[in-house]
Swiss-Prot record:
Catalytic activity: RNA(n+1) + phosphate = RNA(n) + a ribonucleoside 5'-diphosphate
Protein name from the UniProt record: Polyribonucleotide nucleotidyltransferase
Family (UniProt): Belongs to the polyribonucleotide nucleotidyltransferase family.
EC primary class: transferase
PROSITE patterns: KH_TYPE_1, S1
Provenance organism: Treponema denticola (strain ATCC 35405 / DSM 14222 / CIP 103919 / JCM 8153 / KCTC 15104)
Gene giving rise to this polypeptide: pnp
Enzyme Commission number(s) of this protein: 2.7.7.8
């Protein structure tokens, strides 16, 4: 039976409905807001596995082209593999929901939110989070939700809840916040140098909306909720648990504080291996082996957290506010247009910049419409960066981390009008032990400055952590390691300039974080960011004055809009001829902006610009032009003064003395100066060779 609930947000009703579409799924929700609609389904496999130490959850958000009344471009008219945007929204849904599933459920879970309608005014991602949570909440799958999300934009001192695409585009800050009615569990977004206070206020406003949306889902569960399926807890206990604990705990308390990540891993694995061999017969049982591994993880968890809270002792011996040693180096590669290595402790990123033309822009074709991007950032995380063997390729993690770094740097990248190039930054993570995405922000800044990209200001990033015990006891950690990220209660990445925040991402593993902790974490993050910026500025503080000799050069000009056709020529004939002759690439915009790019050192930008100017300019009486003799006649010579524009230089205008034959003075193909004397009633150009010579000799 169809059941629905509604909630007014702004000018439109948010509708959540179940019992009509996709009824064979464990749970399904049709969510609608304005002209956008999401169908979210959740299914669980039939067989439960005992003793799983993770949640086997897959989130596959997808957008259908028909949602926007479009047919996919290209030869194949079917939706293909997930686009980056779909992967990012899948992560947006996964991150706040995954901690609320119980590992003891033991079944594979697949969540499929599908965008089946969009008005191209309201972003569908927030609707997808709400629909996904509601689908799980009303289903028979155990879930400690519900979860909801809200987007907040900030512009001119005002906060806008769930803004439209156009409002987001002009906002000074845009964040997506997710959480439960108890607290915030996830934040991500970008900004144009906003203060920490602006962000805190935005979080508060978002959580008020989240609480209302969670209540809405609870109302729907009362109407249509299913009885939850039972959990499959591991009933067995680890044999010889106390003996294993007594032998391992003191040894781990030492090995976990060795100086490097590799040493800590090797020595901890050695302790584990020795005890596994000692109790080998017992650990032949699969359940006993899982309990054995779980005990080691629990010991590491307790050792690290207790020492931080009781002694302020971190894995590598730092204090809670200390930043690992940082080194920066620019110009590390000979041929690329810009390069830099940023190293922070055992995390290292090689940033490489390539300067391209407008023809290198990233083109997006999705349900939001076609658009182009002239700033591209790609993040690569090869397995060797953590000393492991694995496949190379781009996964969801790479796309997510690259997006965070892109958001953080984008506000400081110059506008196309000031820097008419395409900029591609590639971050090669060469070592990783905590916050490689923030190292990418730093190496990206350094490599762009080295490449001569006129960034508005340098950007740096830092990852913060949180260890809590109860409501009042906590420690905020600056520049966290991988171990602290894994065992902590919060991972909070903040990037920005000396004057404000540009990018941030937060994931919280506990029920929520108080405003006081958030305020202190942001303040401590600012201290760390300023420290990192200071070191980066010692390496390079301003963009290089010149682009690399291997980078393309550009000339820009504006022509009358009614001359665009004349420049292009029939079938692009004129543009192609100029491009081939001067070894350049020419781009013409509808507003008359013409951009001429050099291809290499043999390009003649000035020559190409002169020809473009000539084609698109009207001849002026009294001007002297450098022309080419096209044809010799008995009565004079036809001279081309501008591309496609010829005039007659009469034999009487070749010299002050009598000329018997034109060929005595001029030859076809000869380049000569001529002065435009007049344009007659028929539009014909009358030229003078002798007047031009006299004028230039003055």
């Amino acid at each position: 039976m169809r059941k629905r609930v509604t909630y007014k947000i702004g000018e439109h009703d948010l509708i959540l409905e179940t019992g009509y579409l996709a009824k064979q799924a464990n749970g399904s929700i049709y969510a609608e807001y304005a002209g956008s609609a999401i169908l979210a389904t959740i299914c669980a496999s039939g067989q439960a596995q005992e003793g799983l130490d993770y949640v086997p959850l897959t989130v596959d958000y997808n957008e259908k082209y028909y949602a926007a009344g479009k047919i996919p471009g290209g030869f194949i008219k079917r939706e293909g593999r997930p686009k980056d945007k779909e992967i990012l929204v899948s992560r947006l849904i996964d991150r706040p929901m995954r901690p609320l599933f119980n590992k003891e459920f033991g079944r594979e879970i697949q969540l499929v939110p599908t965008c089946i309608s969009t008005d191209m005014i309201n972003p569908p991602d927030i609707l997808a989070v709400i629909a996904s949570s509601a689908a799980v909440h009303i289903s028979d799958i155990p879930f400690d939700g519900p979860v909801a999300a809200a987007r907040v934009a900030y512009k001119n001192g005002e906060y806008i809840i769930n803004p439209t695409f156009s409002q987001i585009e002009t906002a000074d800050m845009e964040i997506v916040v997710a959480g439960t009615k108890e607290g915030i569990t996830m934040v991500e977004g970008g900004a144009n140098e906003v203060s920490e206070e602006v962000m805190l206020t935005a979080l508060e406003k978002a959580h008020e909306m989240i609480k209302s949306l969670c209540k809405m889902q609870e109302d729907l569960r009362e109407l249509a909720g299913k009885e939850k399926l039972p959990l499959v807890p591991l009933e067995a206990e680890l044999e010889n648990k106390q003996a294993i604990y007594d032998e391992a705990f003191p040894r781990l308390s030492k090995t976990l504080y060795l100086s490097t990540k590799m040493e800590r891993r090797e020595e901890s694995d050695k302790v584990k291996k020795e005890l596994a061999e000692k109790y080998a017969e017992q650990l032949e049982d699969e359940i006993q082996l899982k309990l054995f591994n779980a005990l080691f993880e629990e010991m590491e968890y307790n050792i690290l957290r207790t020492n931080i809270l009781d002694k302020g002792l971190r894995v590598d011996g730092r204090g809670t506010k200390d930043i690992r040693p940082i080194t920066c180096e620019i110009g590390v590669l000979p041929r690329p247009h810009g390069s830099a290595v940023f190293t922070r402790g055992e995390t290292q990123s090689l940033g490489v910049v390539t300067i391209g033309t407008v023809f290198d822009e990233q083109i997006y074709d999705d349900i939001e419409g076609d658009r182009r991007e002239n700033f591209i950032l790609h993040y690569n995380f090869p397995p060797f960066s953590v000393g492991e063997v694995g496949r190379l390729g781009t996964g969801r993690r790479e796309i997510g981390h690259g997006n965070l770094a892109h958001r953080s740097l984008y506000p400081m990248v110059p506008e196309r009008e000031k820097f008419p190039y395409t900029v591609r930054v590639v971050s090669e993570v060469l070592e990783s032990n905590g916050s490689s995405s923030m190292a990418t922000v730093c190496s990206g800044t350094l490599s762009m400055l080295h490449a001569g990209v006129p960034m508005k200001k340098p950007v740096a990033g830092i990852a913060m952590g949180l260890i809590t015990e109860g409501n009042d006891r906590y420690a905020i950690l600056s520049d966290i390691l991988g171990e602290e990220d894994h065992l902590g209660d919060m991972d909070f990445k903040v990037a920005g300039t000396a004057d404000g925040i540009t990018g941030f991402q937060m994931d919280i593993k506990i029920a929520g974080v108080s405003p006081e902790i958030m305020k202190n974490a942001l303040a401590q993050a600012k201290e760390g960011r300023m420290h990192i910026l200071g070191i980066m500025n010692q390496c390079i503080s301003a963009p290089n004055a010149e682009l690399s000799q291997y980078a393309p050069r550009v000339e820009m000009m504006t022509i009358p809009e009614d001359k665009i056709g004349a420049l292009i020529g029939p079938g692009g004939k004129n543009v192609k001829a100029i491009s081939d002759k001067y070894n350049v690439t020419i781009n013409t915009e509808n507003d008359g902006t013409v951009t001429i790019y050099s291809k290499d050192g043999t390009s003649d930008l000035k020559g190409a610009k002169s020809i473009v100017k000539g084609i698109t300019s009207d001849p002026e009486v009294g001007m002297v032009y450098d022309g080419t003799v096209k044809k010799i006649m008995d009565f004079g010579a036809f001279v081309e003064i501008l591309p496609g524009k010829e005039g007659l230089c009469h034999i009487s205008k070749l010299s002050r003395s009598r000329v018997e034959k034109v060929s005595d003075v001029l030859k076809e193909g000869q380049e000569i100066p001529v002065k435009l004397l007049e344009i007659d009633k028929l539009g014909r150009l009358n030229l003078s060779y002798v007047d031009a010579l006299e004028e230039r000799s003055k």
